[in-house]
Regions:
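Small/polar/charged residue-enriched interaction surfaces, especially the RNA/DNA-contacting tracks
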Residues: 1-135
Length: 135
């Protein structure tokens, strides 16, 4: 973990949480906190590409994990526009092909940490069955 980079990423992460729809009306679904923590553990136990591939799949979880992958990409790139579903996977794959997978893994991990920290700036909320946040 690069503390300086994490500090640089926190404001980007705060914005990315809102831009990707993870945070809504000042609240964030608590399930996203658990998902981002398990993503970090998955990177530590396996590979960054396999973790991204798993989290890029639309599964039966309370949290839309594809939004987390988009948020991580937005934090790394500093982008706020439309982000493709597989943008983070494509980015890390390109870095791997350039021989920079270790650096890319560090950036992804730091972005995930920044997102986890930025989530604390939002009020906890729960998703109702309609998919909107309740406070």
């Amino acid at each position: 973990m690069n503390k300086k980079r994490v500090d640089e990423y926190i404001p980007r992460a705060y914005r990315a949480l809102s831009d990707t729809g993870i945070a809504d009306n000042g609240t964030i679904d608590a399930s996203y906190k658990g998902q981002i923590a398990s993503f970090g553990a998955m990177i530590a136990m396996g590979s960054v590409l396999s973790a991204i591939a798993l989290f890029s799949a639309r599964g039966k979880t309370d949290a839309d994990r594809t939004k987390l992958m988009k948020a991580i990409y937005a934090v790394i790139q500093g982008s706020t526009g439309e982000i493709a579903d597989n943008a983070l996977f494509d980015y890390v794959q390109a870095e791997k092909n350039r021989g920079e997978i270790r650096f890319a893994k560090e950036k992804v991990t730091d972005a995930a940490i920044a997102l986890k920290l930025a989530m604390n700036l939002y009020e906890p909320g729960e998703k109702n069955r309609g998919g909107t946040a309740n406070t």
